[in-house]
Amino acid sequence: MKLRVDLQFFAGEKTEKATPKKRKDTRKKGQVAKSSDVNTAVSLLVIFLSLIAIGPYMRDRLLSFIETFYTESLTMKLSESNVHTLFVSLLKDMGMILAPILLVALVAGVVSNYMQVGFLFSAEVIQPKLEKLDPIKGFKRIYSMRAIVELIKSILKIVVVGFAAFAVLWLHYGEILRLPLLTPEEALSFVSKLTLWMGLSGAGALLILAGLDYLYQRFDYEKNIKMSKQDIKDEYKKSEGDPIIKSKIKQRQREMAMRRMMQEVPKADVIITNPTHYAIALKYDEEKMDAPYIVAKGVDHLALKIRKIAKEHDVMMVENRPLARALYDQVEIDQAVPEEFFKVLAEILAYVYKTKQKVY
């Protein structure tokens, strides 16, 4: 009993790496290997690091705002203009306090995104799609492998960040217990530093998870854009044309070129032969041409065909083995013969013209 295996079954399996065209097309659709956790982690880390530098500025601005609010704003007469002035002043002060952090977060987010995918804008991502409203597909997305991975990632982030924060608190356990004994300024300074260390620890832990997530996203992306052998064949046909059709076109072009070449053989003045392997058809008109040029050439069966046509049309054939081989190798069809061959060709053409005069 013979077991027959249909190889077409395996042709549909996506086992091949994506072609450059497939990668380009998916990129245009906004499908790239990217982890949003990297943007979040980098932004948080840069924000907390920048607080080391701009923290004193923010503290001074905040204390100045509080002082002004309690010394001046609370004593102002309640009126529409004063409320408006107070509201504008509040927005201005809050903007001055938060602007550096917001700017740092924006720059960090843009840079981290650029490092992952480069410059990319795809309108297709923001286009509304009715398939997203399909409850069946929505249900499948909820219980898909990607959803499970996202759930695991969320749990890991909570656990890791929680552990990092707990570790910082545990390391400063004694100092936390002494907080009631500190002055307000000392307590504020300690809490600020503690918050900063917790933020840096949490952001660092998130960055490690984000790096792992990026590797997973890249692996998942490569898996999703894999192609089957049939996909690659179809893509090649669309971009380059069907190989069978292209080969037929090339064959037709060769046949047409061959036909045109053979039509020029009767017009030749002489055929230089090897005598059996090479045949070179030359034409020369001293009134129109500076040098003889080749109208046809060939080897073996093609040389035989050229000699046959030449014989049918009484075109003289001259045997010169080295010249025939040299002309075949160095000169193309419809190309003038180089100067180095002028002397020997002049002798051959003179012999041909002299022979024709005797005949006629």
UniProtKB/Swiss-Prot annotation:
Gene3D superfamilies of this UniProt entry? 6.10.250.2080, secretion proteins EscU
Instruction: Give the UniProt subcellular location, in the record's own words.
Output: Cell membrane
- Give the intrachain disulfide bonds: none
Q: Which residues cross the membrane?
A: 38-58, 94-114, 151-171, 196-216
Q: Which UniProt keywords apply?
A: Bacterial flagellum biogenesis, Bacterial flagellum protein export, Cell membrane, Membrane, Protein transport, Transmembrane, Transmembrane helix, Transport
Note one Pfam family from the annotation. Answer: Bac_export_2
Provide the primary localization: membrane
GO annotations of cellular component type: plasma membrane
- State the membrane topology: Multi-pass membrane protein
Q: Tell me the first and last residues of the signal peptide.
A: none
Q: Give any single GO term for biological process.
A: bacterial-type flagellum-dependent swarming motility
UniProt function note: May be involved in the export of flagellum proteins.
Q: Which family does it belong to?
A: Belongs to the type III secretion exporter family.
The entry's protein name is Flagellar biosynthetic protein FlhB
Q: Which organism is it from?
A: Bacillus subtilis (strain 168)
